[in-house]
Amino acid sequence: MERTYAASPASVFNAWADPQLRRLWGTPSEDVEIRNDAADFRVGGEDIQSCLVGGEVVATVVGRYHDIVADRRIIYTEVISEAGVLLGVSLVSAEFLPSGTGTRLVLTLQTVAVEGSDLLEGVAAGWSGALDRLAQQLDAT
């Protein structure tokens, strides 16, 4: 997936790195709320997020950071589960490339679904919605 934003690579990277900002744009739609249960943005650090719909937890995502280069790249894994049952694992790579006065974001996802055949489509659709919401968040700042 690729998107171009009118903000600098540093601004787009910061929106990704700051857990409070990411909570605002990281949802696939306005129907989903993200709760940050833990946030440790560093190589080896772990984020734990609960995805809520109507106040009920529908999924838990545990992320572990493997590579962070400020304003350039983030590589991490996400373990996705529901009620303690593993649904899948994603490898996520986000590259922040200068593009004129803005940023071209290149997001590469590799997801393995363990349970639930709709997980792959859900992950892709969720990221697409989140990246659209990131544009709105960047425009608001």
Regions found by a protein language model. Name each.
Residues 17-18, 70, 132, 139:
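Residues at helix-coil transition
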Residues 111-141:
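A conserved amphipathic terminal alpha-helix motif
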Residues 1-10, 66, 97-104:
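Aromatic-glycine hotspot motif
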